[in-house]
Amino acid sequence: MNPLTKVKLINELNEREVQLGVAEKVSWHSEYKHSAWIFVGGLPYELTEGDIICVFSQYGEIVNINLVRDKKTGKSKGFCFLCYEDQRSTVLAVDNFNGIKIKGRTIRVDHVSNYRAPQESEDVDDVTRELQEKGCGVKTPPSSPPEVSEDEDAKLTKKHKKDKKEKKKRKKEKTEGQAQAEQPSCSRSATVKEKKDERASRKHSSKTSERAQKSEHRESKKSHSGSPDGRSSYHARAEDPECKARKEKPKHEHKSASRREAEEKSRERERGRSSGTHSGRHRGHSDGRSHRSRSRSRSPDKSHRHKKYRHSRERDSYHGSDRRHH
């Protein structure tokens, strides 16, 4: 089959897989998953191994290359075999490099299922021998630990010591927690009972104090209500506007100036009214007392006059009877 037709067929397969969204496991590339070698044909004769590595190393690290040459002349025959470090690089190389042109020639790239490296012969050059033995992959130097300065080393040691101390503290806390958890249940129940007893005693004492306060308050109310002095003092306290003002002061400290002025005016009015009521009561008591004293003073005069009148009538009647007898 013509190599160009092979290139077209491979490209058509790749396009169909992309359109259908075929998974990697079902793709035709999965048949060559055990081989990391690819075939490259249609190369210009002027290219060397280095040129080919520069082009094909875009999709992975190349481990080995075998550019086929003529044994007599040593010229390349236009095709080679490449081995990648990672097998997935072969899929990328086949999909992307197949059908490209290098120096006006279209190249063909395809998988190789079972490739055997050529055996050593006397005609092989020293360069090809080294490539076949060592490969063309770049050997990375062993990673040496970075140099650490003295300050950094001291900081690291301090951090290490701090970490050790923190670990020891955590271990101690864990051991203490385990020891507390291993305590007998009776000790826990005893502590719980003690706490409950303390709470109950506090509640009982608070209740008894509240009851005593309530009883004292009731007795004081009864004593005030039973005695007239207590009543009068109670009414006086209730009517006293100054006491009300004192009680209302802390509650209404946040009021505005206008409200305070209105309150002062109302207090003055209440004071005037209370003074008027007290004076009226005092006058009423004084008038009642004077009226009683007058009535008492008048009553003995009336009785004395009545006695004199009776005594004069008795005399007149006695003298009249004497005259009749004579």
From Swiss-Prot:
Gene Ontology terms describing biological process: mRNA splicing, via spliceosome
Crosslink feature (Glycyl lysine isopeptide (Lys-Gly) (interchain with G-Cter in SUMO2)) location: K8
Pfam families: RRM_1
Keywords attached to this entry: Isopeptide bond, mRNA processing, mRNA splicing, Nucleus, Phosphoprotein, RNA-binding, Spliceosome, Ubl conjugation
Phosphothreonine: modified positions: T140
Compositionally biased tracts (Basic residues): 157-172, 291-312
Domain RRM, chain residue ranges per copy: 36-114
MF terms (GO), sorted A to Z: RNA binding
Location (main, coarse): nucleus
Residue ranges of the region described as Disordered: 117-326
Domain of life: Eukaryota
Amino acid composition bias (Polar residues), ranges on this chain: 177-190
Keyword Transferase annotated: no
GO cellular component, one term: endoplasmic reticulum
Modified residues (Phosphoserine): S149, S274
Regions of compositional bias (Basic and acidic residues) in chain numbering: 191-200, 207-219, 236-245, 255-273, 313-326
Location(s), subcellular: Nucleus
Subunit structure: Part of the activated spliceosome B/catalytic step 1 spliceosome, one of the forms of the spliceosome which has a well-formed active site but still cannot catalyze the branching reaction and is composed of at least 52 proteins, the U2, U5 and U6 snRNAs and the pre-mRNA. Component of the minor spliceosome, which splices U12-type introns.
Function: Involved in pre-mRNA splicing as component of the activated spliceosome. As a component of the minor spliceosome, involved in the splicing of U12-type introns in pre-mRNAs.
Stated family: Belongs to the IST3 family.
Protein's UniProt name: RNA-binding motif protein, X-linked 2
The species this protein was found in: Mus musculus
